């Protein structure tokens, strides 16, 4: 799958260079003009995306945790507060670069807490035909963790590729599918891959409101865990100005399984997150 993603990325990048002139004339009359559409890239301008959220995590086997406080040597049954700021610059209207800074404060009930800082740089490009929209992107995230009761989590690097394709499936309805691939390196010699497949609908019931609803299936290759999650996604935006939108997004893990052995072993079913964000274009 990694080779397929890489080949697709290079092929679509070459095609996009030929398609950009055609896009410029049609962009104002397509769903791409909707700044909340997942394919939207601002034309020769900036977009700021500010997010703050709360989440309940049932299992993250890649995070080391004190055994006395969790019952396992990894993170279980915790809640977190997250905040991030992402700045995107649209270079041509179909190609953009972006960078973000994020902070995550995580605490297990009745136990101590730890925090994490993230830095991300990336790029994305749209390849557009008459009916289908296609976006490819790549980014790298570096994460730094504080100690948790003398338990250390190594700094990690997450290299991410994605491919997204969508088309209008009805009046005011835009359907899309997304494939994500991550390869995560941490510690001196530890590494695992993760994959996500998402199917969703972007709905525009009015000129000022939009909504997204979908499902995501994800799995990883982390040794000893190999988690598999099915997650329900729901979100909505209200455009308060032509260049500003307020959003509320939520997700909930409907089903989860893994290869962790033992009676009553944990999984991620029932995990959820709720996030508020503001998009501002300038």
Positions of the model-derived regions?
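Transmembrane beta-barrel strands of outer-membrane/channel proteins
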Residues: 50-56, 99-103, 136-142, 177-181, ...
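Hydrophobic h-region of N-terminal signal peptides that target proteins for export
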Residues: 10-17
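Repeated loop/turn-to-beta-strand initiation elements of outer-membrane beta-barrel proteins
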Residues: 46, 59, 93-99, 129-136, ...
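Outer-membrane beta-barrel biogenesis signature
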Residues: 19-59, 202-209
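Outer-membrane pore/translocation modules
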Residues: 97-193, 199
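Outer-membrane beta-barrel "beta-signal"
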Residues: 238, 252, 268-282
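Surface-exposed strand-loop-strand hairpins of Gram-negative outer-membrane beta-barrel proteins
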Residues: 54-83, 107-113, 256-264
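Outer-membrane beta-barrel architecture
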Residues: 38, 49, 86, 122-124, ...
